[in-house]
Amino acid sequence: MVKMIALYKQPQDKEKFDEHYFQTHVPITAKIPGLRNMKVTKITGTPMGGESEYYLLCEMYYDSYESFKEAMKTSEAKASAKDLMSFAGDIVTLMVGEEVEND
């Protein structure tokens, strides 16, 4: 299983961010062909009780790296990327990883 991870720093206006993210961006992203699952986590703090520099984490799951690459070529993925850059381009870090089994 391959996943793309989007890690967002604290936005200046959390209410405005949440409204756009959940009402606009998530529905656009959910249309990407090959996307198997999308999990969103709001970061609530650090293990020591402090405030985290991060606000939100989104994990988007694909069957394989090949299916992920194909998905990124679609108009739906391009629409998601365009929307992402319009509201969070300065606070998001994107990465791709492959899940591994602990033996």
Show which residues each predicted segment covers.
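Macromolecular interaction modules
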Residues: M1-D103
